[in-house]
A protein has these predicted regions:
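Generic start-of-chain signal for non-secretory N-termini
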Residues: 1-21, 28
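Long, highly charged, low-complexity intrinsically disordered interaction regions
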Residues: 2-5, 63-81, 91, 417-515, ...
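Short, ordered loop/turn segments at secondary-structure junctions
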Residues: 39-41, 130, 239, 321, ...
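Duplex nucleic acid-engaging cores and interfaces of nucleic-acid transaction enzymes
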Residues: 51-54, 61, 65-75, 79-318, ...
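Structured, non-catalytic alpha/beta "coupling" segments that mediate domain-domain communication
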Residues: 75, 89, 99-102, 226-239, ...
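A glycine-rich phosphate-binding loop feature that marks nucleotide/adenosyl-phosphate handling sites
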Residues: 179-186, 319-323, 377-382, 401-408, ...
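Single-stranded RNA-binding regions, centering on S1/OB-family and related RNA-binding modules
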Residues: 542-710
Length: 710
């Protein structure tokens, strides 16, 4: 079975069997995807995280299918109907739909029309009709008129019911209809009569019809949502006449009275059994594909958001802006600890701008603030303008930060534990400030689904979505690495090999024993075994550690290699890291071993070049157009600066500084053809856009980037 799996995975994924075998072996030993991708390149042949995850997903699917096979085999054996030929077919089948087709005739059924007919003794009549030789079947049917069968027509109808079930359970028939659905199924949606007003948001789908194979994931999910809400009536299917003709060619072999009865049974089988069954199958299959696409888009957006550029360890003022209730202001030190909070009222109805600025200036000086983070919600533009109208005594950078999900964090258990003595407004402002300092460290505290970068996220498979988003967060956290002495429990939880319990144990150990001075000290943490240490150590950094390698992505298992490099050059590790000239003299091929290849050595040399480098780029200041505050200020043809706020498979949404985001359709993103928005844009990217159309009634803005960002 194992070799079969390896062969099938290789064919499906285009990865050599040996690499799949070794990757699965590492996964079965408890190695994580980030660890395997980073530190076991020689073993896997350099597979990346996406490939390793694909191996795991497909392997799990095959295992599920194998379990289903066992259940089916057991069920057929219990009925005493297993044959050598049937067993061989089951053994050779690795397609879910085919497997279920094989099992269908043996599957326990509720009391079907065919079953009732069999109980009435009509199966021999059905067999007679299927042979299609009898010139006068009605005459032969008279023998079956007894008991619950009242007349010849009832006998014929019962026989047709048995034939219809046989047609439905016939593999060739099912594949015939399945192929028709695959090639030509049309998805049709219509508004439910009398619900036009209630269904206004689904106006685009009030009377739409398109081939299923060309229906994009976002359209399909929107249509299915409308159906779930009882606002749209949805159907799916190929040409019925063509399908029944195909089935008749399979089963009707004579143009006599028996053949006519079989033709009737075939039409009934298609309409009552086959079509609904295959329609359900294709509805589920198309929904699964749409889910996978929506989840892929969400995960990619989340990755870009988590890997947004950090300001770094600077003293920051966070402002959660507002009108009536004022602006909540907090001051944080370079480690993100809360130093001070108060309210200011620069806007109506209170309108105390002079007093507000005086307070801001005093806080800037008292707490030596280096940057200001303003939430991008209500009163954001007004607060930014209020601050920029004044001249500060010191050089201060002002940033507008997304506050999506901040309110969810502020009311969460995590926030209450961090700030038990403060209300939600303070916690929200702190979150805004910390997002500027380190988006990744702050956003891991929030359920990814609350961050607002998904499409139809509530309509997709929730367990699959959670798994994908959790893996995305884990991937990002391990890509960046974390400071072992400052990372929160929530951040540490996502580190390879840790999880909630070990993460909490690390924080507890830190509180009791002070800062870690070396990675080896991790082995003193309760429940930290050698395997967990192996998995996590390379992703945890200790700035200013006695061993400088403890602040790099070099794994402790490779320290001896770096030490040997330094020894061969007549220096210590610190001198090797500090001297470009010394590093030029390293000949990596000298350090090759049976287990350490060139990929690992190249990674080590990159780390020595830039120890503990952050893969996230430097942060940039951005300004919206000062003349645009609301949708009423917009004009067609206007060119504006914007920030990409969300990406879907049909385009990108851009924040242009007003309440409503504009949409740049896929066709308007570039001067060339692109199939994926991620080819040209990323979350939080600064872009220039031109307004194509404004729909004031529906609050929709169409934008273009063609010719704007060259």
């Amino acid at each position: 079975m194992t070799q079969t799996f390896h062969r099938m995975l290789s064919a499906t994924l285009g990865i050599p069997e040996k690499q799949i075998e070794k990757t699965l072996s590492l996964l079965s030993e408890g190695a994580t995807i980030p660890f395997i991708s980073r530190y076991r390149k020689e073993v896997t042949g350099g597979l990346n995280e996406v490939q390793i995850e694909a191996i795991q997903i497909q392997y799990d699917k095959l295992n599920e299918l194998a379990k289903r096979k066992e259940t089916i085999v057991h069920a057929i054996e219990e009925q005493g109907k297993m044959t050598a030929e049937l067993q061989k077919r089951l053994d050779e089948t690795w397609d879910s739909a085919t497997l279920e087709d094989i099992y269908l005739p043996y599957k326990p059924k509720r009391k079907t029309r065919a079953e009732i007919a069999r109980q009435r003794g009509l199966e021999p009549l059905a067999t007679l009709l299927m042979l299609q030789r009898e010139p006068n079947p009605e005459k032969r049917a008279e023998a079956y008129v007894k008991g619950e069968v009242k007349n010849v027509e009832e006998a014929m109808k019962g026989a047709r019911d048995i034939i219809a079930e046989q047609v439905n359970e016939n593999e060739r028939a099912r594949n015939c209809i399945r192929n028709a659905f695959s090639r030509q199924a049309i998805l049709t949606a219509k508004v439910v009569k009398g619900k036009e007003e209630e269904a206004a948001k689904f106006r685009d789908y009030f009377d739409c019809s398109e081939p299923l194979k060309r229906c994009s994931s976002h359209r399909l999910l929107a249509i299915r949502r409308g159906e779930a809400e009882g606002l749209l009536k949805v159907s799916l299917g190929p040409d019925d006449d063509e399908c029944t003709e195909r089935l008749e060619r399979l089963f009707v072999r004579s143009n006599n009275a028996c053949g006519q009865q079989v033709a009737q049974a075939v039409q009934d089988a298609y309409k009552r059994l086959l079509k609904p069954s295959i329609e359900t199958e294709f509805a589920a299959l198309s929904k699964e594909r749409a889910d996978d696409e929506a989840i892929r888009v969400f995960a990619e957006n989340l990755r870009q958001l988590l890997l947004a550029s950090p300001l770094g360890q600077k003293r920051v003022m966070g402002i959660d802006p507002g009108f009536r209730t004022g602006c909540k202001v907090v001051c944080l030190d370079a480690q993100g600890n809360l130093l001070h909070n108060e309210n200011i009222y620069p806007h109506p109805p209170v309108s105390k701008p002079k007093e507000a600025f005086a307070k801001v200036q005093k806080m800037l000086e008292t707490y030596k603030i280096e940057a200001i983070a303003i939430g991008n919600g209500t009163a954001s533009r007004e607060t930014e303008e209020f601050l920029k109208q004044h001249t500060f005594r010191q050089d201060i950078q002002i940033f507008v930060v997304s506050e999506q999900g901040a309110s969810i964090y502020s009311a969460s258990k995590i926030a209450r534990e961090e700030f038990p003595d403060y209300d939600v407004t303070v916690r929200g402002a702190v979150s805004i400030a910390r997002r500027l300092m380190d988006p990744l460290a702050e956003l891991v505290k929030i359920d990814p689904k609350s961050i607002g970068v998904g499409q139809y996220q509530h309509d997709v498979d929730q367990s699959k979505l959670k798994k994908s988003l959790d893996q995305t967060v884990e991937s990002c956290v391990n890509l960046v690495g974390v400071n072992l002495n400052t990372a929160s429990t929530h951040l540490l939880t996502y580190i390879s090999g840790l999880g909630p319990q070990l993460a909490q144990n690390i924080v507890n150990y830190r509180a009791e024993n002070g800062a870690f001075t070396s990675r080896k000290e991790l082995l003193k943490v309760p429940r930290m075994g050698n395997k967990a240490f192996e998995q996590c150590a390379g992703f945890l950094r200790i700035p200013h550690a006695k061993n400088p390698l403890d602040n790099t992505a070099v794994h402790p298992e490779s320290y001896c290699i770096v030490e040997q490099m330094a020894k061969d050059l007549g220096c210590n590790v610190s001198e090797l890291i500090a001297s470009k000239e010394l590093r030029k003299n390293i000949k990596p091929e000298r350090y090759l071993t049976p287990t350490v290849g060139m990929p690992t050595l190249q990674d080590i040399l990159q780390e020595l070049e830039k120890p503990g480098r952050d893969p996230r780029g430097p942060i940039k200041v951005f300004e919206f157009d000062k003349n645009v505050r609301t949708i009423d200020d917009l004009q067609v043809g206007m060119e504006l600066p914007g920030i990409v706020s969300n990406i879907t498979n049909f385009g990108a949404f851009v924040d242009i500084g007003i309440k409503e985001n504009g949409l740049v359709h896929l066709s308007q993103l570039a001067d060339r053809y692109i199939s994926d928005p991620n080819e040209v844009v990323s979350i939080h990217q600064h872009v220039r856009v031109k307004i194509l159309n404004i729909d004031l009634e529906r609050k929709r803005i169409q934008l273009t980037m063609k010719g704007m960002n060259g």
